[in-house]
Amino acid sequence: MSLFNSSLNSKYDEISKLEMEEICSDIKNSPFDENKIAGLTKVLAKSGETLEFFNLDTADIPSTGGPSSLSTIISPLILKEYFAVPKLGIVGRPAGGIDVLAQIQGYNLKLSKKEIYEIIDKTQYCHFISNNHFAPLDSKLFKYRSENNFKNVPGLVIASLLSKKVAVDIKNVCLDVRYSHFGNFGNSLDEAIKLSDNFKLVSSLLGINSTFYFSDNTKLLQPYIGRGESLLAIHEYFLDIKNNWLNHHIEYDCREMVSTLTNHKIDLPELKSIIIKNFTENIECQGGSVGSFEKVVQKTKDSHIYEFSAKKSGILRIDMMKMRDTIVKIQSKYRDKGHEFPDPCGLIFLKNQKENISKNEAVLTFRVLENDLEYFKDELNKFIIID
């Protein structure tokens, strides 16, 4: 295998598909080897620019991906009370921290090293995208994995997750593990725990302290699904709109993730004011404004002109994989037309899984561009099931 030869350690854009196939096949077909995965992680991390924070204790809460969590936006706002948080993010499917914050006009995700250091020095937290500067080989290898049936290989998943942390000198990680049959970190809780043990072995070799928070990716963690909807959810939380479902996700899930690293929980009365303060500070430090945030929120809210109602009485089920894939497919259509982080559709659930629904009762509201309305309606009938 050419894992450590000169060609892999040269410029990331010079690596061939054959070399990537060798790497992926070797790791897929071999017993788990933490030393090999740690070695690959270092190569990926050092394929571009790197950050160093000699005098700061750094931390991050990355996730394994899933359609309904707000953790990559909310958790850093709490975490920065204890650590410096240089958050190198990736695009979500359908709504991750990077692409959600990108909806705010002026918010700068493509930061230089100098800008990152300045913002961290000033506020302890910034959120940015690789932009082919940080761990670019990881981005290239991820694209190859996605296209060639290597996406869910555990060793490759672990190397990819950790390479982005090593590149920006993260010393503490709580991995938000979302397990499901359509995820990349275990089909079940037992599988996810086993993979987390492997993750910890590798992270320890890299000098990173790691903890974990597990959730079932087949369940809706909160009801706002989409890029604009994620900002609307945050705004509703700020305004004290009573939504126990949303509040539990923010005040329990996101707060609990942070506490795995700090062994301390911020009191609930104080939590909201901290999140509001740090969210506002971050938006303004990275070039956005509260006014632009509120404008996106209002536009999203006003666009929810459609309603989906139950065609019969029964128990509500949601096919989370089909829901995710439907939204991502529509997003991809507009990304191909030159929009880097398009936001053409979204959902707000009024009912949760396993609730008893009456015929004609509203299950959710949604927004979608007119060109995609009929397709979206058809797909809704496939991923919303009443038994």
Can you say where each PLM-predicted feature lies in the sequence?
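Well-ordered secondary-structure scaffolds
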Residues: 3, 7-14, 152, 170-387
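Phosphate/diphosphate-binding glycine-rich loops and adjacent basic-rich segments that engage nucleotide
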Residues: 121-168
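Acidic, glycine/proline-rich low-complexity segments that act as flexible tails and inter-domain linkers
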Residues: 1-68, 104, 282
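Short acidic, glycine/serine/threonine-rich loops at helix termini
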Residues: 72, 96-100, 131, 138-142, ...
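A glycine-rich helix N-cap at a beta->alpha junction
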Residues: 100-126, 196-203, 207
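General beta-strand structural signal in soluble alpha/beta enzymes
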Residues: 60, 85-89, 109-112, 127-130, ...
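Glycine/serine-rich anion-binding loops at beta->alpha junctions
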Residues: 56-95
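Active-site-proximal beta-alpha loop/turn segments in soluble metabolic enzymes
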Residues: 24-28, 137-147, 176-186, 217-220
